[in-house]
Every structure is written in C-alpha cells, then in structure tokens.
C-alpha cells in the first residue's frame, strides 16, 4: 500500500459527511421531538449511502479506517459516557437490550470486515451495506408503526417488516450495482444487475427474519454477510 494524499482527503471528506448527517438528523429530531430510536433508524438509513463512495479509494485500507474509527468512537467516545452528545441516538436505544443497543457498533464492524474481505469485488460490499442500511433500517423505522401487522409465530418479526427489508434492500442493491458499473469496478453486466440485486435482497430479507432469539440483536451481522455471500457467488 502506497501513501495517498487523495485517499486521506477522501477519508476526511466521508467523516465530515457522516458527522454532518448525524448532526443534522439529531437537530431535526430534537426540534420535532422524535424519539431517540426514530433518530437512530434515520441515521442508520442515511449514513449507509456513504458506502457508495468506495470506488473513489485506491486501496482497501483507507475506507477501512472509516468504520474502524466510528467503532472506536462508539466504544470510547463521549457518547459512551453520557447521552447528550451528537452520537447518543446512535448508541443508546429505548426498550433495547444492551446487545441490541450496540447495533450501530455491529454495523461498523460488519462493514470493516467486508471491505478488506471482498475488496476485489467492492460492489458486493457496497450492495450488502446498502441492503443493511436501507432494508433493515426501513424495517426498523416503519414496520413497528404499521397498525395491522401480520407477525410470524416466532421472534416478534412481521411479514410487513420482511417486505420492507426486501423492497428497500432491493432498491439499495440496484443503486450500488449501478454505481459500481458506472465507476468501472463491477464485472456484472447491466442485464444481470436486477437478478443479482434480487438475490442479495432476498438473502438479507431471510437473514433478518431468521435473526431471532439470541441472534436478534445481531442482524447487522447476519443481513450484510448473507447478502454479500450470495451476491459474491451470483456475480462470479
């Protein structure tokens, strides 16, 4: 790996964008008196889009610094000690177990693992993170507010939530594969983008629905890893 000033600048830019998103949503949420969980879910969805900047980096190490740094901040930053900081809605949940309230940390860890692991197929990483961000994030934000949900007989998950994971994840994956194709980092023909995205979203949907019991707090691992594996195989 060679030192790259351009990549360092990109790291700073993406950090700045992330904190701007978090700060803006925190400000709007407080003005509108939204719950911390609603703000957290909105951040989950909005920040996922930064993964689409992955093709702008020349080596996996530089984008790897982004989730690594955010994970360290979540663990040891000011929000780990008090609730009034900008990151607090991301870390501290309501009616969540301690493991589930650390969902954003798992979000960062799974992204940090995927970046070096699938760097040769970085569009897989982009699509998997988008499925996690848009699909799982939308389900968490919208599904609990649907009055007439059709719950599965296990785990407290709903059909409506699964549909949201699939539909928004499918849209996010298509966006990621399209960006990858335009950036010249995807080997998937345009005509196959829909089918590969479909399989990735389906894998994420099934993984999210199956994340019950002890696995329920860890859907930020099960969803992106399942999606990434199937899309990696489907795009080979």
Task: Locate predicted features.
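Interhelical loop and helix-boundary elements at the membrane-water interface
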Residues: 2-9, 23-64, 76-233
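Glycine/aspartate-rich loop-and-adjacent alpha/beta segment that forms the canonical ThDP
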Residues: 17-21
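Selective transmembrane alpha-helices of multi-pass membrane proteins
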Residues: 69-72
